[in-house]
Curated annotation (Swiss-Prot):
GO terms for molecular function: metal ion binding; oxidoreductase activity. Residues 13-217 form the Cytochrome b561 domain. This is Probable ascorbate-specific transmembrane electron transporter 1. Residues 31-48, 104-121, 173-194 are extracellular. Heme b 1 binds at residues 50, 118. Binds 2 heme b groups non-covalently. Its cofactor is heme b. Its EC number is 1.-.-.-.
């Protein structure tokens, strides 16, 4: 399935938005929220690691893994496949550490865990992400299924991957909303600089995710690599 447009312009837009989103979340957590720390008497610094790792390490790196076939269309397929696999693995590790930091913050601050939709979706999404990675490793890398099996499961692998990716984006949006709501209920100015920064960061993430999805389902060139197409056509 193609959209009649090439992927390249959307990968450029996605990369620009990724830089913007990463910069904005760092400004938020370091300038407005006081910095980052794995160990601190100020427990909020521990929490600050969570949005940074989840956005930059989990969503942005995961997005790069999704777009690698479009960003490097002339590279050997086995090379881009390995990059795809490694980037997803790194994103998964960063996501796990980011979730650990949220639990650590809650536990050390006496806050209950897993009570919100954001937390439920977060755990569910990273579990699905892990399952998707394991399936992709076994089917396409090692021990690697037969060509006919790979051809049959590839569309499902792509569709499920995009589903998990969109779910991760939705979870991030809920996270921004939840944290900003908590801050505003504690006295943060609803129309202040920090509130606007968080809201605009969330909007940038939506646009970024949309660019990644469009790039993923658009052809990189006239002829896609033999074994990989965004959504293989019948």
């Amino acid at each position: 399935m193609g959209l009649g447009v090439r992927a390249a312009p959307f990968t450029y837009v996605a990369h620009a938005l990724a830089v913007a989103a990463a910069t904005m979340v760092l400004v938020w957590c370091i300038h407005f929220r006081g910095g980052l720390a794995f160990e601190a008497t100020n427990k909020n610094l521990i929490f600050n690691v969570h949005p940074v790792l989840m956005l930059i390490g989990y969503i942005i790196l995961g997005s790069e893994a999704i777009m690698v076939y479009k960003v490097l269309p002339t590279w050997k397929h086995d090379t881009t496949k390995l990059i795809h696999l490694i980037l997803h693995a790194i994103a998964l590790v960063f996501g796990a550490v980011g979730i650990y930091c949220a639990f650590k913050f809650h536990n050390e601050s006496g806050i209950a865990n897993l009570y919100s939709l954001h937390s439920w979706l977060g755990i569910g999404t990273i579990c699905l992400y892990g399952i998707q990675w394991i399936f992709g490793f076994v089917a396409f890398f090692f021990p690697r299924a037969s060509p006919s099996v790979r051809k049959g499961v590839l569309p499902w692998h792509i569709l499920f991957g995009l589903f998990v990716y969109i779910l991760a984006l939705a979870t991030a949006e809920l996270g921004f909303l939840e944290k900003l709501t908590f801050l505003q209920s504690s006295g943060l100015d609803k129309y202040g600089a920090e509130a606007f920064l968080v809201n605009f960061t969330a909007l940038i993430v939506v646009l970024f995710g949309a660019s990644v999805v469009v790039a993923a389902v658009s052809p990189a060139r006239v002829e896609e690599p033999h074994e990989y197409a965004p959504i293989p056509e019948s």
